[in-house]
Swiss-Prot record:
HAMAP family noted in UniProt: ThiI
InterPro entries: Rhodanese-like_dom (IPR001763), Rhodanese-like_dom_sf (IPR036873), Rossmann-like_a/b/a_fold (IPR014729), ThiI_AANH (IPR020536), ThiI_fer (IPR054173), ThiI_N (IPR049961), THII_Thiazole_biosynth_dom (IPR026340), THUMP_dom (IPR004114)
Molecular function, one GO term: tRNA-uracil-4 sulfurtransferase activity
Example of a GO biological process term: thiamine diphosphate biosynthetic process
Stated name of the protein: tRNA sulfurtransferase
Keywords: ATP-binding, Cytoplasm, Disulfide bond, Nucleotide-binding, Redox-active center, RNA-binding, Thiamine biosynthesis, Transferase, tRNA-binding
Top EC group: transferase
Annotated residues for binding of ATP: 183-184, 265, 287, 296
CDD domains in the record: PPase_ThiI, RHOD, THUMP_ThiI
Disulfides per UniProt: 344-456
EC identifiers of the protein: 2.8.1.4
Amino acid sequence: MKFIIKLFPEITIKSQSVRLRFIKILTGNIRNVLKHYDETLAVVRHWDHIEVRAKDENQREAIRDALTRIPGIHHILEVEDHAYTDMHNIFEQALALYRERLEGKTFCVRVKRRGKHEFSSQDVERYVGGGLNQHIETARVNLTAPQITVHLEIEQDRLLLIKSRNEGIGGYPIGTQEDVLSLISGGFDSGVSSYMLMRRGCRVHYCFFNLGGAAHEIGVKQVAHYLWNRFGSSHRVRFVAIDFDPVVGEILEKVDDGQMGVVLKRMMVRAASKIAERYGVQALVTGEALGQVSSQTLTNLRLIDNASDTLILRPLISHDKEHIIKQARELGTEDFAKTMPEYCGVISKSPTVKAVKAKIEAEEGHFDFSILDRVVSEARNIDIREIAEQTSQEVVEVETVASFVPTDVLLDIRAPDEQDDKPLALDQVEIKSLPFYKLGTQFGDLDQSKTYLLYCERGVMSRLQALYLREQGFSNVKVYRP
């Protein structure tokens, strides 16, 4: 099988040296992502496209899906590569592929050529289009608004019959811009803002301020791992967790109620800046949007920026909440965010919307900054690829099984669309469906006299959720890994 990768248009208008560098990086990214599907896969770069060839037909859909999620790709053409002899042979091959698809439809033919030929692209369009129109009685030509466009590409002596076109996410290849550190909370905003910087070519590392215990950290790890695995797995990234409870406690004790929100954000920026400096990261990323909460007015954002010299990027600054939630839904992070607790918003009862610099600095004068230095020095840094392995160690007390007894219940915790795509079909065991994002609120309603075997495709989510349920006091859970 063969795929033709078309570049994001902004790449094609770069200077020759920059364009070549971007294409080289994108080629490497594609190779890094796809090697997990087919080790014999070949990725070849050209001036205006990238070619992917693979032998394992069983991985066709997986490879196509992975390509649609790699930044830098505008669209993907799945093609059949054949030799041809003349225009009539081109028509015959097009007829064999498109006959059933064109029945009862309007169509046109569009041809792109590379190389020297005795015919023009328009000659092929007219010949093939006329032949299809004659041989498919219910098909009709429509050059302005066809229902189906027959795409053909001719490269020297090869004919590429385009079977399907799939849109990519566009943007720049990851690695073409410098690294950033995303302050991730697991909510709608931070997930979307992280994705937007990945799409713009940045390798996004994650910094999490833990205010809600192990369960909160598990949830945020799920979001970060999901974003990385889905859109950024071509690169290694860090997940840094900072226990911010001591800082919050100091703020609650020493800082005036109305200033708490801004002071907390300034402390987070200071801590994240230290982490960024430690790892050579150039900028911080937040999900802040203008006016969304009290700390996100222009006055307060300026004061938050002043807490550090590190550049702070806010890709969602002009987005409204409805639009952000829609983006989260499209990315697949909405379900995570809906069940993620919000701890920051309850710290102050009457927050100021127009903080005064002198007053903020006076309140911070009461703060013991050695606490901030300590929590930063104790920050836990892991390779995001190790989240699954680390979770396995954390859930060592949760048994992993490959078989079941008739009294067990297999709990499919995958998202509904995943369950529809690959439904479980097992005999001699009861199967229930309860998506992972509903476990926290609905697991307690199940019959607690039974043992539940949590299942997801890769075992990462099931282990994370098993740990979460254990912490909630449920001992009747195991992880099912066939």
